[in-house]
UniProtKB/Swiss-Prot annotation:
One of the record's GO molecular function terms: DNA-binding transcription factor binding
Gene label: MEF2C
Domain text: The beta domain, missing in a number of isoforms, is required for enhancement of transcriptional activity.
Name under which the protein is recorded: Myocyte-specific enhancer factor 2C
UniProt similarity note: Belongs to the MEF2 family.
Summary of the tissues where the protein is detected: Expressed in brain and skeletal muscle.
Organism: Homo sapiens (Human)
Length: 473
């Protein structure tokens, strides 16, 4: 490896100049020592630095060498800097350039210096190796975490495949989840009034853990449901149409539900053969699976201007086994083509008023749809006590059948109020009159959550009733 060349000029940096002077002074004395030993001569060095500080070196005694110098009168060799530069030029070397002084100094070649440099080199190599290790990109420690949406012991209303395995668990539904259950994610708008064809739903599934079309779990796997009081009002205030029960659970997978489109003046009629076929299949499915009538307790009411307006703000539904309906009772309930299954518990005076205003074909189809839904889901509402009553005896026929389709008038009233299927679609907004009938009649839902008109909302006849022992008779 070649030596680094430096330019022989005055060093401008004071510190660098001082370091270079100390190093080269020691190198010069080392060379004088080697020369005196190797060649058996006497050498004396006298050095003054830039601050006129004296540094001297003598191979023997300085005074003795200086005495010889003063007494010597014969011709002798005397050189200056210019002579050295000229001699270097003749040898082919540039006088302004010189090898690295570190290579000539004794400091760089002493055993102590070599050990120190060796240690420094080892430290540098170790540091470089550490830097290479640190330069390697760190491994990815991210671990995928899967969060289960539904568990075996939890009920999520927004999950369409959630299951309930623990019959003793009564979960509280989150407001956002309750709002999701009423969202139009599972809804299908029926065709407009101009269309004469009905809305055909998909095949009804019989899965044990699937949910109904309204987002609630299958009652076969959910013996107890508890809805928090503040969430029902949020559902009624949601700006979305109510969901249609197109995915109702049933044991007949080939059964299709025909839901007529909503209109004011034209309601498509269905033949009696289709009605009898639907009722026969519904009765067969209900006889194969008995319906446990729920014991409904009415919770804290809300203000008249909020939520359902005078109706209970939450319904705590528990499934009792002491009251059950047989297939004979359920078949007798279809007196007007199972239209009484719209409200299995009781029908208020306001509800009867609007049920009288509906044509029998619409009532027959609503009964055929809602009875299938009520056979699988027990989300019932019992807001007051009126005519339709069910006794607890399994074989006795029901009493007070006053809501048959033969007693309904064939004309339709639109200015008096809304029908239950129309009032549910307008439950998310303010009940401001009959000017919204043109927009509300196209939504239909068999859910029994209704809302009174403004004139009947303040009526003292509409009262709440707590049912603790059984059904009202």
């Amino acid at each position: 490896m070649g030596r680094k060349k430096i330019q022989i000029t005055r060093i401008m940096d004071e510190r660098n100049r001082q370091v270079t002077f100390t190093k080269r002074k020691f190198g010069l004395m080392k060379k004088a020592y080697e020369l005196s030993v190797l060649c058996d001569c006497e050498i004396a060095l006298i050095i003054f630095n830039s601050t006129n500080k004296l540094f001297q070196y003598a191979s023997t005694d300085m005074d003795k060498v200086l005495l010889k110098y003063t007494e010597y009168n014969e011709p002798h060799e005397s050189r200056t800097n210019s002579d050295i530069v000229e001699t270097l030029r003749k040898k082919g070397l540039n006088g302004c350039d010189s090898p690295d002084p570190d290579a000539d100094d004794s400091v760089g070649h002493s055993p102590e210096s070599e050990d120190k440099y060796r240690k420094i080199n080892e430290d540098i190599d170790l540091m470089i190796s550490r830097q290479r290790l640190c330069a390697v990109p760190p491994p990815n420690f991210e671990m995928p975490v899967s969060i289960p949406v539904s568990s075996h012991n939890s009920l999520v209303y927004s999950n369409p495949v959630s299951s309930l395995g623990n019959p003793n668990l009564l979960p509280l539904a989150h407001p956002s989840l309750q709002r999701n259950s009423m969202s139009p994610g599972v809804t299908h708008r029926p065709p407009s009034a101009g269309n004469t064809g009905g809305l055909m739903g998909g095949d009804l599934t019989s899965g044990a853990g699937t949910s109904a079309g309204n987002g609630y779990g299958n009652p076969r796997n959910s013996p107890g449901l508890l809805v928090s009081p503040g969430n029902l009002n949020k559902n009624m205030q949601a700006k979305s149409p109510p969901p249609m029960n197109l995915g109702m659970n049933n044991r007949k997978p080939d059964l299709r539900v025909l839901i007529p489109p909503g209109s004011k003046n034209t309601m498509p009629s269905v033949s009696e053969d289709v009605d009898l076929l639907l009722n026969q299949r519904i009765n067969n499915s209900q006889s194969a699976q008995s319906l446990a009538t729920p014991v409904v307790s009415v919770a804290t009411p809300t203000l008249p201007g909020q939520g359902m307006g005078g109706y209970p703000s939450a319904i705590s539904t528990t499934y009792g086994t002491e009251y059950s309906l047989s297939s004979a009772d359920l078949s007798s309930l279809s007196g007007f083509n199972t239209a009484s299954a719209l409200h299995l518990g009781s029908v208020t005076g306001w509800q009867q008023q609007h049920l009288h205003n509906m044509p029998p074909s619409a009532l027959s189809q609503l009964g055929a749809c809602t009875s299938t839904h009520l056979s699988q889901s027990s989300n019932l509402s019992l807001p007051s006590t009126q005519s339709l009553n069910i006794k607890s005896e399994p074989v006795s026929p029901p009493r007070d059948r006053t809501t048959t389709p033969s007693r309904y008038p064939q004309h339709t009233r639109h200015e008096a109020g809304r029908s239950p299927v129309d009032s549910l679609s307008s439950c998310s907004s303010s009940y401001d009159g009959s000017d919204r009938e043109d927009h509300r009649n196209e939504f239909h839902s068999p859910i029994g959550l209704t809302r009174p008109s403004p004139d009947e909302r303040e009526s003292p006849s509409v009262k709440r009733m707590r049912l603790s022992e059984g059904w009202a008779t």
